[in-house]
Amino acid sequence: MNIAFVKYREFKELRDINEAKTKITEAFYLVSTTSLKQKTKQELQLDLSAKKIIISNKSLKTQEIKLPKDLIYYHTYTSNLNSLKLSFTKNGNISKSFSIYIFNRAKKVRYKISFYGFDKSRFLKINNYRKKKNSEITYSNIDEYHKNTNEDREIFYVDWRKE
């Protein structure tokens, strides 16, 4: 294979991952801050099979954000559902913490975005993690890996670097 082609493919993958990370994080912050400012419940729909985010707001028109098509996305909110509808409280918070993993075309995880809803802070917290080059985590074993690293954070920090 041509080295220039391989480097271009790696560059495009990194660009797509950064775009996806930014769009997902900004969409969640937008809905969270809007619900906090307006003191109203807001909704965000995450459709990972169609690779888009839909923001529904009673006072604003529905907004659709398209995610990069070449990547694969997985969330830990519920089991085996590619579509997920989240409601944000009047305080801009979510009821259940969860994560979104971003995979490359080879189905190897490259990025993790964690969303936390806390009663004390009453505001959504988002952490971004970049995969270190240690072990390979694939789409087929991500559910088990996520459960194990939630129980053992030392393993988690061997594989991930917080940004």
Language-model features, listed with the residues they occupy:
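N-terminal helix-rich module
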Residues: 3, 9, 19-22, 33, ...
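Short, conserved clusters of charged catalytic residues that mark active-site
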Residues: 26
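Interdomain signal-transducing alpha-helical coiled-coil linkers
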Residues: 14-17
